[in-house]
Structures are given as structure tokens and as C-alpha cells.
């Protein structure tokens, strides 16, 4: 090395390890409208001060590394670094705190959830100085959200395509989820749609297995859709799962669905990946297909209260990546979901502007500007007795999906669909007449069952079925 080079490298540079808080903890920082803001629940190792742990999160998820490097002098760290700008305690948790981190917009590629998550929820989650780390919420500024297409169509366009207004949409997941032949599968689809459902659905793990290859399933389901439409005079759909082992195969399945003329396809966005999902969402908008999203694998990421990522962040990411429906819990069924928290991320999916509300877990005000909304899907362990609560909790802009609650009807699939449609229409009418579904819901169902034998039979079968476990996802 020449003396000249040694001099250059040594000016303003001292090798060694610095405390992160000297550079990345900046409580005086005033956040900008263009910053991406994150709220992390941090559990540091014993002896690590909160300021150092919060600064470490900001550093490792932006420009920092474990030691000082001389190439820091070749760029403007003040322009690009993440900043831990606030720290607050977590009530009832002495070893945890919330670290608020601001990221400058230039750190992220436009229109890429993949790049956003690679930084913010990347290697930092394995950092040894932290015992656990959870991303509770993100504020996505309009300057960044406008670089995304978002949902292929959105709520209003979907209603216009289906010509269905003033009520939640009704769906059913075909069961058993695995093992049926394509023809028997199509038969179940037809019976459910003929009975009054708007949609039927592939289960998340139905792709293209030996017992039912995807092309056969698509053809028989399309036949079922057209036959049910002709008999009922209503537009029908089946969520044809295009998820595949490669993006090329996924797109081939979506193209075939479009050629069949069906209205909607489906994707498992977490197991399939954000890059694949965004590609499919763009194809769906360009070709008039609705896109149903399943969240398989989400609980691996969001179930633990002190580590991982809250589903409200995954929901925001999906709205940017693209989807017209996404599963979001039921509050009353078999799957995890506390009411206020669930409705918090339901609003983040549907609404244009959502105010900060810590009681519902919403850490930041979120302005989606003109990005279309996503219909939340309530699915998992629900039946006709849940219909009043679901109608009251989720309102009209939702999809209520009954799998076992349709196909488990003692008289068969079509009567199961009839029971659900009658229960829904009765609840919507009662609500529109000013009745309180929270208090009078069971009576509304009993009254409707007097003139619907299908509903009466369903009420008898599921009158004792409850899923009463304490929710894990609490504030």
C-alpha cells in the first residue's frame, strides 16, 4: 500500500467497534412525511440498554454493520441511515419496549415488497444482542405506496363485476381439502353455487397433486360455474388456486383460467412469495381477473407475541403487493383473532385513511391515498349460528366463507349453501330494519329457520359447536 493511500484511508477513520447508539439513536429527530416508520417490540439480552438495542435494530436494518468500516466515508450516512427516534415501555412487560425507527425512502426499491421486507425484517431478527424482536406496525408514506399497483381491482370494481351489492359475499372451501377427483370436486362446486353461494374455493394446499391435476380441476370447476350461473341467474366464481412451484407455472395456470372465462384466481402469497404475488396481481389487473389471497404460513410469522411480525404488517404488505381478497380471521370461529385487533387490520385493508389507534394496535396513521381496498375474508370454523355476529362485525364489505359449515349439512352440499344464504339474507334484512344483531341475532336465525327447513336442519346440527379459547393476539 502506498503512503498516499494509507493517508487517505486514515483520515477521519478509526477502526474498531462503536456503540450503535452514538450514530443510530437520535431522539431529537423529527420524522418526515416521506419516511417509512416502524414500531418494533424489542426484548434485549440482559445488560443491553434499551437505547443501544433500539439503535442496533435501526442500524442492522439499514446501513449499519458490526464494526466501523472506512467506506462509511464514501457516502452520506445521515441521508441513508435508519434512526431510532423514540423508545417507550410495554405495559406489564419489564424486559420489553417499543422502539420507533424511521427509514429514509431512498433505502427501498420502488414497487417492491420483497426489497422492503429484506431490509426491515431481514437479518436484524437474528441479531444476538436481542432475545426477541417483533415488528408491530409500519407507516407506509404515500410517496412510497404510490409506486405500487396494489389490488388488481378493489372492492367497488369487484361488486360491479359480480353485480352484487348491499351484503357480504358468501363462500365455501371445498372439503375434504385433499383427495377428491377433479370431477367429484367440480360436482361439489356446482352444488354449493347452485344452492346460493357466490364463490367456492380451492383450499390453500390444493395445487396439482396426483389425485387431481390442476388442468382437470380448472375445467370441471369452470363447467360447474357456468351451469350454476345458468340455473340461478347470478354471477358465480371459484377461487382457482394458481400457486405453483415456479412463477412460470403459476402464470401458465392463471392464463388458462382466463381462457376458460372464469372471474377469479387464487394465490398463497406467503408460501408463494411476494415477487410471485406481485407478478400475478399485475397479470390479473391487465386481464380482468379478480385475485383471492390465502395467508397460509402467517401464524409461523405472527403468532408469537414477542417475536416475528404482526399480521397487520402482512396485511399492509399484501395490499401493496396486490390482492382483492385476503383471509383475516373470524373473531368467532376456530382460528386466532381478537375483535378490536382484527377490526384494526380489517380497516387497514379496506379503508383509504386510518387514524392511529393504539387500543386496536394501530401505531401510525395510514393514508393509502387512492389505492383500492381489499375485501377481508372470514373463514375457519364458522356456521349459521355465527352469521349474525359475522354480519355485525365485518359489515357488507367482506366475504364470509363456510367450508364445513356448508358441506357438513346433514342433507348435502346444496342444502348447506341454502341454509347459509337464508341466514345471511335474514341477518342483512334485520340489520336494515334497525334490529341489533349483537343482542337479537339468535332470534333472527330462529325466525328465519321457521320457513327454511334447510336452515332449521343446520341450526340443529351446529347448536352446540363453539371454539372458546383465550386469544393470544392481544395488546
Swiss-Prot record:
Chain positions with N-acetylproline modification: 3
PROSITE patterns: RUBISCO_LARGE (PS00157)
Cofactor: Mg(2+)
Residue ranges the record assigns to the propeptide: 1-2
Residues reported in the UniProt entry to bind substrate: 123, 173, 177, 295, 327, 379
Coiled-coil residue spans: none
Cofactor remark: Binds 1 Mg(2+) ion per subunit.
The enzyme's E.C. designation: 4.1.1.39
GO CC annotation terms, alphabetical: chloroplast
Modified residues (N6-carboxylysine): 201
Entry-linked Pfam families: RuBisCO_large, RuBisCO_large_N
Reactions performed catalytically: 2 (2R)-3-phosphoglycerate + 2 H(+) = D-ribulose 1,5-bisphosphate + CO2 + H2O; D-ribulose 1,5-bisphosphate + O2 = 2-phosphoglycolate + (2R)-3-phosphoglycerate + 2 H(+)
Role, per record: RuBisCO catalyzes two reactions: the carboxylation of D-ribulose 1,5-bisphosphate, the primary event in carbon dioxide fixation, as well as the oxidative fragmentation of the pentose substrate in the photorespiration process. Both reactions occur simultaneously and in competition at the same active site.
Entry protein name: Ribulose bisphosphate carboxylase large chain
Source organism of this protein record: Picea pungens (Colorado spruce)
Gene: rbcL
